[in-house]
């Protein structure tokens, strides 16, 4: 059996490391570590990727590509010519378009074309949630599109798909439920510029902190430069930059609730990690968030302030016993439904099915 796999990604992230970890236990995984976020590097990256593929296609069992984009086109094309199976993993922004918010890869005509070509050429799509395939969008009242998902934007796409959710390790993300601070709401948003403030719901977190002054709101993942732009902030809102997972768990261990008020999400990792630490989820009705939360927390149907304020008051009136129960349920749901072993099993099934 051929044991070599190519794994392509546009930038390195912790959730990619998890994939590489379990794949490397069974296969020899070869990666190409280019960062495609700098537009000035697009053409040089294409050249480097072409050379990489020429050198590594021989003897390759399969190619995995995280997200659709410029970086997924050449691997998909190479797979089509050589017969090597190519699996693209749509993760969020590569399935949505919000022109009014300057968000979503599919709002850009050229990027959208490369994504469409990639999705057409590849063997199978492995989205992290069904909402990225096709879903109604009702969260924003003035949304650009009534639906989101790659089958909405590419209605003629014939490539099959299989949903494989992100996976998490309950043994690593764990905390004592007795160590929670009352009325504490942690929010996590990897944000370096003002555009992300609206996308990730940071604007709503700030409003909530101003209104509910007896609550505390740790906000993790905001760059120092953006923090300065947002200042002054309410005294009960503490801003932290991106941090190690160990420090992050320390903050999760103290927080009673976790806020995920994004206007668009794929399958939010931080939400699940917080739930494993017994944080009660409070999340917007977008992407995978409602199905992740289910009956373990609170789904926010709209960002409209009157509704949000009333909903938040209801959340604060939840009794201590009920809060404890919800925290336990939140951890159990992620541990049962989204265990890393499930993702590993699904990927290995697909790779083991390949002839040869």
Named regions from a protein language model:
Residues 298-306, 314-320:
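Conserved acidic donor-binding segment of nucleotide-sugar-dependent glycosyltransferases
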């Amino acid at each position: 059996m051929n044991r070599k796999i190519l794994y392509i990604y546009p930038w390195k992230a912790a959730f990619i490391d998890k994939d590489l970890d379990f794949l490397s236990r069974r296969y020899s995984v070869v990666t190409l570590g280019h960062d495609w976020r700098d537009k000035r590097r697009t053409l040089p990256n294409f050249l480097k990727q072409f050379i990489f593929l020429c050198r590594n296609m021989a003897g390759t069992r399969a190619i995995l590509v995280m997200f659709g984009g410029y970086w997924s086109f050449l691997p998909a094309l190479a797979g089509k010519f050589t017969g090597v199976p190519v699996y693209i993993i749509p993760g969020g922004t590569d399935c949505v378009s919000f022109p009014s918010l300057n968000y979503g890869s599919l709002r850009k005509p050229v990027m959208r074309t490369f994504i469409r070509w990639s999705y057409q050429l590849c063997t199978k799509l492995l989205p992290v949630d069904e909402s990225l395939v096709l879903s109604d969008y009702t969260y924003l009242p003035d949304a650009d599109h009534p639906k989101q998902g790659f089958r909405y934007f590419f209605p003629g796409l014939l490539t099959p798909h299989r949903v494989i959710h992100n996976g998490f390790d309950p043994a690593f993300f764990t905390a004592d439920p007795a160590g929670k601070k009352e009325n504490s709401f942690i929010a996590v948003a990897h944000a370096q510029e003002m555009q992300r403030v609206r996308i990730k719901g940071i604007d709503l977190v700030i409003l909530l902190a101003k209104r509910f002054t007896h609550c505390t709101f740790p906000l993790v993942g905001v760059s120092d430069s953006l923090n300065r732009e947002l200042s002054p902030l309410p005294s009960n809102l503490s801003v932290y930059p991106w941090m190690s997972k160990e420090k992050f768990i320390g903050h999760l261990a103290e927080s009673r609730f976790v806020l995920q008020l994004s206007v668009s999400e794929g399958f939010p990792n931080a939400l699940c990690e917080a739930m494993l630490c017994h944080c009660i989820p409070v999340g917007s009705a977008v992407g995978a968030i409602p199905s992740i939360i289910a009956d373990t927390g609170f789904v926010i149907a709209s960002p409209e302030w009157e509704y949000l304020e009333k909903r938040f008051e209801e959340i604060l009136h939840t009794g201590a016993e009920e809060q404890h129960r919800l925290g336990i349920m939140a951890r159990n749901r992620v541990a049962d439904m989204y265990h890393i072993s499930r993702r590993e099993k699904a990927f290995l099934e697909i790779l083991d099915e390949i002839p040869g």
